[in-house]
Regions:
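Short glycine-rich phosphate-binding loop at a beta-alpha junction
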Residues: 194-211
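Non-catalytic, compositionally simple segments
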Residues: 1-114, 123-125, 139-183
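Metal-dependent DNA phosphodiester-chemistry modules and their immediately adjacent helices/loops
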Residues: 15-45, 157-169, 213, 217, ...
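Short, surface-exposed connector motifs at secondary-structure boundaries
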Residues: 190-199, 227-230
Length: 322
C-alpha cells in the first residue's frame, strides 16, 4: 500500500473496499494489525509468494532488522507487510543504543580522526562529534556548546538539564549570550594541531559565516576548500543525509560504535526520528519541538566523513565476518 491516507493508491483501495464501482475487484494481501509484525504469520499474510520466489531468509532478516532498529520498521511494514503506516519513526531503539555504550578511549591522538560539525544559530546548541577507529570499532567523542548566559532559563524552556550537564563537564559554555563562530574556529584549530584530523563534515548552510573565522585562526585555503580540504560540506536534506544515516545505522546494528553513554549525545539520540520521502530517502528530524538532535546529526556526518577513509572498508569487513 501507499504510506498515507492521502496517496492516490490509498484512495483507490478505499473506494474499492466501499464497493462504489461493481466493475472493480480488490485483492489486498496485508498483515492484520493485531499480529506480531515480525512474525512469519504476519509476513505470510501479506506475501502469498513467501518461500516460493520471494526469498524467505532475506525477508525474515529484514523483519529482524526492523525489530531491532525502529527507523527501519515503517519501511518494513509498508513494503513487506503492505500496511499503511506513518513513515516517521525513532532512528535508534534504546536497546541498540545502549548496546553500543562501551567506554571510549581517553585520547584520540595518533589515530585517524573524522568529525561532524552541526553549527546552530549562535544562541542554540552547537555540536562537534569526532570518531576514531580502535580495534575495529568507531569510538565517539562529542563536544557540545551553549551560551553560558541564560543557561538555566534555556534549560527550563527546553526541559533539558543543560545547567547540570555544564556543571558536570558534559557541556561547554561560551561566554556571553552566543556561541560565536570565532570560538568554534579556535577550538577546531587547536584540534587539528594536536590530532590527525582527516575530514570534518558540516552543514553547508552556515559555512559563509564560519569560513572567514577559520581563515583568521590559521587554516590555509587548501584546508578549507578543494580536493585536499579537511572540511567537507554536507547538505541536510534527504539526498545528502540518507547515505550518512545508512552508514551510522549499519555501525550501530553491528556494534561498531562505542559512545560511552555521553548524556547530551544520548538525549539527542532519544529525540531523533527519521523522516522518509516518497523515494525512500531519509533524514533526521526532531520528535518534539523543544528536543535537540544536533549531536546525532553531527554523528551521522562524522560517520559519512569516515566512510571516505581507506581503512573503513576493513572495519566493514570485520563486521561481516563477525
Amino acid at each position: 500500500q501507499a504510506p498515507t491516507d492521502a496517496d492516490l493508491l490509498s484512495v483507490l483501495i478505499e473506494d474499492a473496499q466501499a464497493g462504489h464501482d461493481p466493475r472493480v475487484v480488490l485483492a489486498l494481501h496485508t498483515a492484520p494489525v493485531d499480529l506480531d509484525p515480525f512474525s512469519e504469520e504476519a509476513i505470510r499474510a501479506a506475501n502469498p509468494a513467501f518461500g516460493d520466489f520471494q526469498n524467505a531468509a532475506e525477508t525474515l532478516a529484514m523483519a529482524e532488522d526492523a525489530r531491532r532498529m525502529p527507523s527501519r520498521e515503517p519501511e518494513y511494514r509498508n513494503l513487506i507487510l503492505n500496511q499503511r503506516v506513518d513513515m516517521n519513526a525513532p532512528f535508534v531503539s534504546q536497546r541498540v543504543w545502549q548496546e553500543c555504550g562501551a567506554p571510549v578511549v581517553d585520547d584520540f591522538r595518533g589515530l585517524p580522526v573524522f568529525g561532524g560539525l552541526d553549527l546552530s544559530e549562535v544562541s542554540d546548541l552547537t555540536a562537534l562529534v569526532l570518531v576514531a577507529p580502535v580495534d575495529g570499532v568507531w569510538h565517539v567523542k562529542p563536544t557540545f556548546w551553549l551560551p553560558g548566559q541564560g543557561l538555566a532559563d534555556k534549560a527550563r524552556a527546553d526541559r533539558v538539564p543543560y545547567d547540570l550537564w555544564a556543571r558536570d563537564g558534559w557541556l561547554q559554555t561560551a561566554p556571553g549570550r552566543t556561541v560565536d563562530y570565532e570560538y568554534v574556529a579556535a577550538h577546531l584549530r587547536d584540534l587539528c594541531e594536536t590530532h590527525d584530523v582527516r575530514k570534518i563534515g558540516f552543514d553547508r548552510w552556515n559555512w559563509r559565516h564560519l569560513k572567514p573565522w577559520l581563515a583568521k585562526v590559521g587554516f590555509a585555503d587548501d584546508q578549507l576548500e578543494g580536493d585536499a580540504a579537511i572540511f567537507e560540506q554536507m547538505g541536510q536534506g534527504f539526498e545528502s543525509m540518507s547515505p550518512a544515516l545508512r552508514d551510522l545505522e549499519s555501525a550501530l546494528l553491528n556494534k561498531r560504535i562505542a559512545h560511552g553513554r555521553h548524556p547530551v549525545l544520548e538525549s539527542c539520540a532519544r529525540n531523533a526520528t527519521v523522516q522518509t520521502d516518497s523515494a525512500g530517502n531519509r533524514k533526521l528530524s526532531k520528535s518534539k519541538s523543544h528536543g535537540r538532535i544536533d549531536g546525532m546529526v553531527a554523528l551521522a556526518m562524522a560517520m559519512s566523513a569516515a566512510g571516505t577513509w581507506e581503512g573503513a572498508a576493513v572495519i566493514d569487513h570485520m563486521a561481516m565476518i563477525g
